[in-house]
Amino acid sequence: MVKLVKSIYTNSDVTSLGELSATDSIDQGIAGAITALTDAATITPDLNASNNFSVSLGGNRTLANPSNITAGQSGSLFITQDGTGSRTLAYGSYFKFAAGTAPTLSTAASSVDRIDYVVASATQIHAVASLDVK
């Protein structure tokens, strides 16, 4: 996990750095990179590497339970069908979707679906899918 630090300025010079406290605020946007995952039969995101991921499916795949999960972490996974399309994605047991039903991905070639997630515990990732994003 990345810790946020604050700069303390005196006459436009940084005089010290410290971690943000509960009473500090952030007045600008914070952006996280979208990290490309390697397409393989089993895809395992490393949540120490990023919060946001992308992958282009070249076949029917399994999204394994991520490594290095931390409760409270959240992010997105952008899933693109290759030029053939109709690729399926199975999900590791940590992924929990509404009503217990995992989404069926869009099937058109080059279509994009997004899965947003929040890590609820060491063994539960609450997830919501936005399908066929255009």
Region spans (language model):
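Exposed extracellular interaction/assembly regions and N-terminal maturation sites
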Residues: D24-F97, S111-K134
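A sequence-level detector of short linear motifs
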Residues: T15, T104, H126-A127
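Beta-strand-rich interaction surfaces with strong enrichment in secreted/lumenal proteins
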Residues: A64-P66, A102-S106
